[in-house]
Structure formats: structure tokens, C-alpha cells
């Protein structure tokens, strides 16, 4: 036999349980090289710079388009 709940889960209990399931907003910053919006601690997808230095072996969006 399958496991069956003893009683119905109320809306309030269900909502309380799901309060931590919401997604957080992304923390965006501006790239210091090209001023586009990027995520923190990530190489810029437009210019390929991270912390003011060009990342080796990274093909940026501008190189792919041309």
C-alpha cells in the first residue's frame, strides 16, 4: 500500500513551507571596461575582461558577431 497523508494540507501550511522557494534577484554590476551590465564575479560576455584584465582563451560576444 502507498503512503497516504493523514489529513489535507491547508493553504497556510503549504504557503509557509514554500516561502523559501522564491528566486533571488540577480546582483548586477557595470563592467569597468565596456560599461555593460554583468553578474558579479563573472567575465564580461561583451569585452572578455575580468577585474580589469583580458581573460586568456575567452571569445567575447564582439568577436563572435564579426
Curated annotation (Swiss-Prot):
One Pfam family hit: Ribosomal_L32p
One CC-aspect GO term: large ribosomal subunit
GO BP terms: translation
UniProt entry tagged with the keyword Ribonucleoprotein: yes
Disordered, as annotated region: 1-21
SUPFAM superfamilies registered for this protein in UniProt: Zn-binding ribosomal proteins
Signal peptide segment: none
Biased composition annotated in UniProt, kind: Basic residues: 1-19
Keywords of this entry: Ribonucleoprotein, Ribosomal protein
GO MF terms, alphabetically ordered: structural constituent of ribosome
Annotated family: Belongs to the bacterial ribosomal protein bL32 family.
HAMAP family linked: Ribosomal_bL32
Protein name as catalogued: Large ribosomal subunit protein bL32
Organism: Mycoplasmopsis synoviae (strain 53) (Mycoplasma synoviae)
Source lineage: Bacteria, Bacillati, Mycoplasmatota, Mycoplasmoidales, Metamycoplasmataceae
Amino acid at each position: 500500500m502507498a503512503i497516504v497523508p493523514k489529513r489535507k494540507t491547508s493553504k497556510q501550511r503549504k504557503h509557509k513551507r514554500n516561502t523559501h522557494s522564491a528566486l533571488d534577484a540577480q546582483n548586477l554590476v557595470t563592467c569597468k571596461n565596456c560599461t555593460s551590465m554583468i553578474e558579479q564575479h563573472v567575465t564580461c560576455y561583451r569585452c572578455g575582461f575580468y577585474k580589469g584584465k583580458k581573460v586568456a582563451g575567452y571569445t567575447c560576444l564582439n568577436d563572435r558577431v564579426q
